[in-house]
A protein has these predicted regions:
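N-terminal positively charged helical leader segments and presequences
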Residues: 1-118
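Short, glycine/polar-rich helix-capping loops at beta-to-alpha or helix-loop-helix junctions
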Residues: 66, 162-168, 231-240
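RNA substrate-binding interface of SAM-dependent RNA methyltransferases
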Residues: 47-50, 120-210, 214
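Structured adenosyl-cofactor binding patch, chiefly the S-adenosyl-L-methionine
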Residues: 43, 48-49, 149, 170-176, ...
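Active-site/ligand-binding-proximal alpha/beta "capping" segment
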Residues: 203-257
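Short, acidic/turn-prone active-site loops that include or flank metal/cofactor-
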Residues: 60-62, 86, 160-162, 229-231, ...
């Protein structure tokens, strides 16, 4: 592995926890993880191949984009039934549902090895996004959508001290979570070490790094680490990164939110990778 000057962290550690597959766990108010809220999210769910038990349509809302959802449900043999707003609110656990919700089989997290296998099956160098302790469901949902649209092979999130893939995240991703692999790991540092063992370059996106557009993302695998809204990338993951990259700011505001920052950097990586 040779490249320009880089930061290297401590010794690699290997763990088996990111090879497990396990169902998403959510609160009872979120219908034990099987409630999906919002028109785009439900439509993407129907197109994903995941098992769908039933679609609920708010009474009187069968018009506009809802007719497309009902037609798609009919093609898949999924019943679409009317329900009052109270039932929808209860099913969705307070998430805005736009008059449409679904009951589906639980989404499953994949392992880190599965994401690497996806890249291998596509004949591509790994392209991964690592979410370091992001707590806002809207930011995580938007980050997942950006990663999916940029062609990333998967996104990695921690099991603790971070938002999980809840109905709010699914809705904020506009259903993109149905089309990208999400790995949940016990130890992000160990996951980073595993990626480095697989010759994946680690880029931490921070305010004080080198301009991202000066980097070559086209040679070899790459993983982009994005930190939480208030704290940024943790010291441990920053120290393990090969490169620290930044988005130069030219206006009166000093930063972008995490999903916007991710979009800027990972779409540049996608551009370079598809030259």
């Amino acid at each position: 592995r040779e490249k320009n000057t880089f930061r290297r962290g401590g010794p690699s550690r290997r763990g088996d926890d990111f090879r497990r597959t396990e169902p998403l766990r959510q609160t009872e108010a979120e219908s034990t993880g099987s409630g999906v809220a919002g028109r785009n999210a439900v439509l993407e769910l129907l197109n994903s191949g995941r098992s769908v038990d039933k679609i609920y349509i708010q009474t009187g809302a069968r018009e506009g984009s809802v007719t497309v959802i009902v037609a798609e449900a009919a093609k898949r043999g999924v019943p679409a039934v009317d329900a009052d707003r109270r039932k929808l609110d209860m099913l969705c656990g307070g998430v805005a549902h736009q008059g449409v919700a679904a009951l589906a089989s639980e989404v499953e997290y994949v392992g880190l090895a599965d994401i690497l296998r996806i890249a291998e099956e596509r004949g591509e160098a790994p392209f991964i996004v690592v979410a370091d302790s992001i707590n806002d469901p809207h930011n995580l949902g938007a980050l997942i959508r950006s990663a999916c649209c940029a062609g990333a092979h998967g996104i990695v999130i921690p099991k603790r001290r971070a938002v999980q893939v809840t109905p709010a995240v699914i809705k904020s991703s506009a259903g993109a979570v149905e089309h990208i692999a999400v790995a949940r790991v016990s130890n992000l540092a160990a996951a980073i070490d595993e990626l480095k063992e697989k010759n994946v370059w680690i880029y931490a996106v921070e305010a004080d790094g080198e301009p991202y557009y000066d980097k070559d993302f086209s040679t070899g695998g790459c993983a982009f680490v994005l930190g939480s809204e208030g704290e940024g990338v943790s010291r441990l993951l920053r120290d393990k990164a090969d490169f620290i990259v930044a988005i130069p700011m030219y206006g009166g505001v000093g930063s972008l939110n995490v999903s916007a920052a991710a979009s800027v950097v990972i779409f540049e990586a996608a551009r370079q990778r598809h030259k």
